[in-house]
Each structure stands twice: as C-alpha cells, then as structure tokens.
Regions:
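Conserved ABC ATPase signature
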Residues: 167-171, 175
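A short, proline-enriched helix->beta-strand linker immediately N-terminal to the Walker B motif
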Residues: 186-190
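Short coil-to-helix segment of the ABC ATPase nucleotide-binding domain corresponding to the Q-loop/switch region
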Residues: 127-135
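ABC ATPase "signature
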Residues: 252-253, 261
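Helix-to-loop junction immediately C-terminal to a conserved catalytic motif
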Residues: 81
C-alpha cells in the first residue's frame, strides 16, 4: 500500500529480476512460472538475487527495505543507481527508465541525483575529513574552494564542525559514519541510498544516528531508501517498509500496517521479535 494518495512516487520498481549464471533467460522464465530458488538452481545452475520485485518509493519519505541476510535487500538497492543491472524489469526515476541511460547520463545520475552511504563508511584514509565530504563535489567538477565550503557546512550540520582537519583513523565509528552521511548529503541529491548504514555501530551510537537522520529529514525531505535487517530500526525510521524474503516482496506498508496487519506468518514473526525485544 502507498503512504497516501497525495504523495507522488519518486522511484517505481517494476517486475525486477536478478539472476546470476549462464542460463539467465531460462531462470527468469522459471521464476515467472512460480519456481523457487532451489528449483532454479537445480535446473539452470543460476543463483537468484531478485524474483519479480515490484514496489514504489514515495518522494520525500524514508522507505526501509528489510529482510534476513540473503533476502535480496542490498541487491535491490544497488539496482537503484545501477551498480547492478537487472536480468529483467524496469526501474523508473521520475518516470524515466534508468536502464535506458548511456554511460554519460548514468555518471550524471550518480553525481547529482542519487547518493549512497555504505555500512563500511568508504572514507579515503589519505584525505582529511573535510576533503572526504567534498569528494563527490570535486568529482563532478565543482570549484575546490566552493566544495570545501559546502563540506564545512555539512560537517557543522552533523555535529563535526571541529573535525574537518582530522583524518578518518582519528575518529570513532559513529563519527566516521557521520562523515559518510555528510558526504552523501553534500551533493544535494534528491535520493539517498543507505545500505545497512548504522549496522556496524554500537547500540547507543546507532540510536543517536537514527535520531540525527530523522532530524535532518525533517528539514531536508529527501527520498531515502534505508536497508536494514532490524525490524525495530525499520519501524522507527520508516514512513514505508518493504519486507523481502528470498528475493520477493512479502509486504509493503506503513509501520502501523506492518504491526497491525502483517501479511503472513513470516512478517508476523518479525513483529513478534520486535515486541519480545522491547524493554
């Protein structure tokens, strides 16, 4: 279900399949006929990443994509900026199929329209914090002085104004992830992809980062796709939640819909797990 009828979709994922192996077309056809991963592997030797995923990502909201390890959530998010291309299906950004983009337009998409935050921070150890934040701006050709000014502004917004001259190995894990977040936001992209961005952090630092993301989102209203395996994190952050299992969508809904009307036993187990871990 969509969040509400007034919220436009920023991204539309239509019947997306991803399989790895030589008999790709046959594997997709078997999946369309209802075959599971085990049968596809046995008959084609192909490994299934995604099996007919369709969902919408509403503009200006946080969509959490969650599931267990191997469910396809990281594979899916990497399709949204074409780090991975699908075996079949379409991915529309503002109504335009990004699979039709040539390399120059794809580079422009990644430099200006979609940014990404990874679990492993991805900071360059030989650059100081300010230059790490400015990196995306410099890559797309912004003047160095302007890029560093923008980087300093974002460091202030994430609470690291005094750390611009430090190097990544001088920072804690939480601080490094703040740098990664500032770097992603500095290019002012409309879409922010966050792949298990807080998963490696200690629980208290993770909670603080969730708070900071929610606070920034109140002001920025970005379209955020947040990957997590933690139902508590998804329910706390998400305006919409998409739950995957074995490369398929089990349920899409608001946190309230997921809690009150789980689509099946699989989704209900996530909700029960969340309630069992509440203090």
């Amino acid at each position: 279900m969509s969040i509400d009828a007034q919220t436009p979709e920023k991204i539309r994922i239509e019947d997306v399949y991803k399989v790895y192996g030589r008999k790709e077309a046959l594997a997709v056809e078997l999946l369309r006929q209802g075959a599971d991963r085990q049968r596809v592997l046995a008959e084609t030797g192909c490994t299934v990443g995604l099996a007919g995923v369709s969902t919408g990502i509403p503009a200006g909201r946080i969509t959490c994509i969650m599931g267990l390890s191997g469910s396809g959530k990281s594979t899916l998010v990497r399709h949204l900026n074409r780090l991975i291309d699908p075996s079949a299906g379409r991915i529309l950004l503002d109504g335009r199929n990004i699979l039709d983009l040539g390399m120059p337009d794809l580079r422009e998409l990644r430099r200006r329209h979609i940014s990404m935050v990874f679990q492993a921070f991805g900071l360059m150890p030989h650059m100081n914090v300010r230059d790490n934040v400015a990196f995306g701006l410099l890559v797309r050709g912004d003047p160095r002085q302007q890029a560093r000014q923008v980087a300093s502004q974002w460091l202030e917004r994430v609470g690291l104004a005094d750390y611009g001259g430090h190097f990544p190995d001088e920072l804690s894990g939480g601080m490094r992830q703040r740098v990664g977040l500032a770097r992603a936001l500095a290019i002012d992209a409309e879409v922010l992809l966050m792949d298990e961005a807080f998963s490696a952090l200690d629980p208290l630092i993770r909670y603080d980062m969730q708070d900071q993301l929610l606070e920034l989102q109140q002001r920025l209203r970005k379209t955020i796709v947040f990957i997590t395996h933690d139902i508590q994190e998804a329910l706390r952050l998400g305006d919409q939640i998409v739950i995957l299992r074995a490369g398929r969508v089990e349920q899409t809904g608001t946190p309230q819909e997921i809690r009150e009307r789980p689509a099946n036993d699989y989704v209900e187990r996530f909700v029960v797990q969340r309630d069992e871990h509440r203090p």
